[in-house]
Amino acid sequence: MAFFKSAVFLVCVVLAAAGSASRSKRALVGGWKTQDPTNPKFENLAHYAVSTQVEGREYYDTVLELLEVQTQIVAGVNYKLKFTTTQSTCKIETGVEYSKELCQPKTNKVEAVCTSIIYTVPWQNIKRVLSYHCDAPNDV
């Protein structure tokens, strides 16, 4: 009987260790997960982020290249996007809305490297820029 209890205990320990090892290979629940930046959904979110940045600007910025994307599942989804920007051809005026199709880059020179976190709750039609920060390209 003692042998049987020892064998059952040993099997339980092995199964627990195997389950723990497989969990460690998966993304941490609530942690950031790296995504493929070539997905058009992420590029659209980056354009959304730049469209909200109008204070103190005469022209909208526009996205040149999406560099990195991470997602985090919360009570919705947080998207952390890192991208390069430059000034666009669209002047910020009352009634003029940003569009990635219309607001083309004035030049292809990178003016800033920006990181933005966008919070979405698709089933409630919520989309908000939580943070937006840019650095000069040589500071990154």
From Swiss-Prot:
The UniProt record lists the keyword Zinc: no
Tissue/organ expression: Expressed in midgut (at protein level).
InterPro entries reported for this sequence: Cystatin_dom, Cystatin_sf
Pfam families xref list: Cystatin
Keyword Calcium: no
Note: Decreases symptoms in mouse model of mannan-induced psoriasis-like inflammation by modulating immune responses.
Family: Belongs to the cystatin family.
Protein name: Mialostatin
Organism: Ixodes ricinus (Common tick)
Source lineage: Eukaryota, Metazoa, Ecdysozoa, Arthropoda, Chelicerata
